[in-house]
Amino acid sequence: MRLNFLFLCCWLSMASYAQTNFEHAIEYRQKLGFLAAHRGVMAHMPKNPAWAGELSYVLRSRGHKAYHRAYNYPTFGGTLFYGQVGNQEILGNYLGVYGYTELPMISFRNYRMDFKFGLGLGYNNHPYDPIKNPLNVAIATRINGLMCLAIKSTYQYKKNAFNIGLDITHFSNAAWKVPNFGINMPFVSVGYARTIVPVDKMKFDPFEGEARAPMNITYKQWYYSVTAILSGKQMMPIGGRRYPVYALNFSAKHFFGHKAGLELALDLISKQAIMDYQPYIVKSQLDILQAGAYAAYLVPLDRFHFVFGMGAYLRDKFSPEDPLYHRIGARYYLKNGLLLNLTLKTHWARADYLEYGIGYTFNYRTR
């Protein structure tokens, strides 16, 4: 959840900087979908269609940074979400706010198709309660993380923009408190946006080189980092204790250009919850140490990078979960080489824990 809060803070700071460098618009989207029962224990929960409305403040980039042109002018924004997730009696209503980025996959004249990735916070009024609401096995906390992944098609005519989209919206507390099977809702949406502050795309002389705010990384070289990670998670059964998680990540990163990078990494993880897994077996700290090899696709937006990765355990003596793990989230790189890491570690659709980390890139140099 802190990952999503910090993502919002980054977006708000960017919005204050965007008075002259971005085109501004207001957008409303209406969404209709269903609650996906991705675990058998959730089969009783979907009862009605899920619906939601989203009101967004939109910032359309106009080229003042080099990566804007590389991505064909991405869009940023902040969204207010309100909806019913498919079972009013058990799950109640959800309110959320999130920041997002839309990266064009196709852009031709007045038409564009975007990939959208958003992170934020959500609130629900019917969390799990052992007496009042024991059937809600999806969410045990009122405040949760919110994630939205979407494909969106937009046609713009002058100051008006019409869009349709497919997305999946997710609520979870990342196993901070159980039960936490999470809420997953596939949606289809239609929307309308109106430009309120028009700004033309910046024009560049091809002989003058890059835009006036170049990327803060160089390409065709490897960057080497180490990151220390701290987290916590609660284990089943319900009402159990919360355990700390300690980890180190050693990584090498290579960027192929403004739009893509590769990360190869080694993870060392000390998940204290394993001490109580199969409690009849005596364990040491060395016994519970997990090691994993990991690869990720990086999406660099200047110093802010999205991370989408997958790994496999090389050492996992007790195998309390699946042999494969996944990581999705974001990092921010400071000018002095320090990096801030906020990612969600999962085993497929099941959250493991949030990774709060701080690291250092040894050969980082700004241009």
Give the positions of each predicted feature.
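Short glycine/proline- and aromatic-enriched beta-strand/turn motifs that initiate or cap beta-hairpins
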Residues: 19-62, 205-253, 361-363, 367
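Transmembrane beta-strands of outer-membrane beta-barrel proteins
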Residues: 24-28, 74-76, 113-119, 162-166, ...
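Residues on the lipid-exposed face of transmembrane beta-strands in outer-membrane beta-barrel proteins
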Residues: 28, 55-59, 99-105, 117-121, ...
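Transmembrane beta-strands of outer-membrane beta-barrel pores
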Residues: 30-36, 59-61, 80-86, 119-127, ...
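Outer-membrane beta-barrel "beta-signal"
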Residues: 55, 184-205, 351-367
